[in-house]
């Protein structure tokens, strides 16, 4: 258990907080997937070499995904061989993988069609997409902002509804790109937005019951930073003491803020911030959602992340606590996973956050359930479990959207 907690502490500590003097260069970096029956050996290598981890294990023999700089490859190979670890290469050259992924197509709106979903896009183009999408559905949508980011950007979303007065039905809130490098969530959340209108039967039925508030990029500063400076950036862009930057926005929500599922190290990727709800982005989100709760109420909240193919229920702060309606939540999560698998064969694991991925205090899902009494709340980890991790090829955007939309529809079918 101690070794797992050490790995959680080490997650991204080497590269997670310092601001680079120029754009981060990942040429020659390898991403290695390792596993072994003694996780303390992996912890030792990560600590000794000061390596970044993308993913750490819940149990012995589970995978750890490690980023290895060119100058440390030889020593990593030597130490991992001596430790008897199993190894696979995820990215032979991370820099090349990023270059391929960042082949952004010029923006030309023609509706939320396959062309848009065939590549990733810059922040400004996402804003144009949302504006154009709203204009195309002007009778049943509006642009909304939950507030301002640390650097002054609007946290922009689209509010869509069916017949009747806007805001009159219970709210469904979807957040994407809370962690800046998780680009597949941006595109998948936008795919869901599009399907609410393009899937004429199912989308219309949902809009008759709920008002949807879709925020594809809940961390705009961090997302811009990933497109301009460091593709692997996770946090927001607040400056911390000691020259490190960023708060983990999914450890900063003002509920069960302190605990083993985050850290006080301002250079760590799981830095929870100086106080509960301190980040401007968190303040904006909590204030906006409280307003919805005080109105027609919050029926569902989903925080979309990547990667690992998980669909999770409360809680993150505790591995023993369960939501009052846990049986309903588990049934909904299972229906999501079953529907996803039926589309492209993609397997999702379900269960409470703490038991399924790791302990995470100060997260959005726990806050939604216990602080504003949202009826249902989930955390998703989208594709993949294969060799790509955060740098998922754009060819997987549409399949991810297709299967996720199927899962969303199935989940709503279980909602009373």
Swiss-Prot record:
Top-rank EC class of the record's enzyme: hydrolase
Cofactor comment text: Binds 1 zinc ion per subunit.
SMART domains for the chain: Zn_pept
BP terms from Gene Ontology: proteolysis
Keywords: Carboxypeptidase, Disulfide bond, Hydrolase, Metal-binding, Metalloprotease, Protease, Secreted, Signal, Virulence, Zinc, Zymogen
E.C. number: 3.4.17.-
GO molecular function, one term: metallocarboxypeptidase activity
Name of protein: Metallocarboxypeptidase A-like protein ARB_03789
């Amino acid at each position: 258990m101690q070794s797992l907690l050490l790995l959680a502490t080490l997650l991204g500590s080497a590269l997670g907080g310092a601001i680079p003097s120029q754009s981060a260069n990942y040429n020659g970096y390898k991403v290695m997937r390792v596993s072994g029956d003694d996780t303390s050996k992996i912890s030792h290598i990560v600590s000794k070499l000061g390596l970044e981890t993308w993913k750490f294990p819940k149990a012995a023999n589970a995978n750890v995904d490690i980023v290895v700089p060119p100058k440390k490859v030889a020593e990593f190979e030597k130490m991992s061989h001596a430790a008897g670890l199993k190894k696979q290469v995820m990215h032979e050259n991370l820099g090349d993988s990023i270059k391929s992924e960042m082949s952004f197509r010029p923006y030309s709106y023609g509706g939320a069609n396959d062309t848009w979903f065939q590549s990733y896009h810059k922040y400004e183009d996402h804003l144009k997409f949302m504006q154009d999408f709203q204009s195309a559905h002007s009778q049943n949508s509006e642009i909304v902002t939950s507030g301002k980011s640390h650097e002054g950007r609007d946290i922009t979303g689209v509010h869509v509804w069916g017949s009747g007065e806007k805001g009159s039905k219970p709210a469904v809130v979807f957040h994407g790109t809370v962690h800046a490098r998780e680009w597949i969530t941006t595109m998948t959340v936008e795919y869901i937005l599009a399907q609410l209108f393009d899937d004429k039967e199912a989308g219309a039925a949902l809009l008759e019951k709920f008002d949807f508030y879709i925020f594809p990029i809940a961390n705009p500063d961090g997302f811009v930073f990933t497109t301009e400076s460091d593709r692997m950036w996770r946090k927001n862009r607040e400056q911390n003491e000691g020259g490190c930057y960023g708060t983990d926005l999914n450890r900063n929500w003002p509920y069960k803020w302190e605990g083993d599922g985050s850290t006080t190290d301002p250079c760590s990727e799981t830095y929870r911030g100086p106080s509960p709800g301190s980040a401007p982005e968190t303040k904006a989100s909590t204030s906006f959602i409280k307003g919805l709760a005080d109105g027609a109420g919050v029926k569902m909240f989903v925080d979309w992340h990547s990667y690992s193919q998980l669909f999770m229920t409360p809680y993150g702060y505790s591995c023993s606590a369960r939501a009052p309606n846990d049986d309903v939540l588990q049934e909904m999560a299972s229906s999501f996973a079953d529907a996803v698998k039926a589309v492209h064969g993609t397997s999702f694991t379900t269960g409470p956050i703490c038991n399924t991925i790791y302990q995470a205090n100060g997260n959005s899902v726990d806050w939604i359930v216990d602080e504003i009494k949202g009826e249902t709340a989930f955390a998703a980890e989208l594709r993949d479990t294969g060799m790509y991790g955060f740098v998922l090829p754009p060819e997987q955007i549409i399949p991810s959207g297709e299967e996720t939309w199927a899962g969303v529809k199935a989940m709503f079918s279980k909602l009373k």
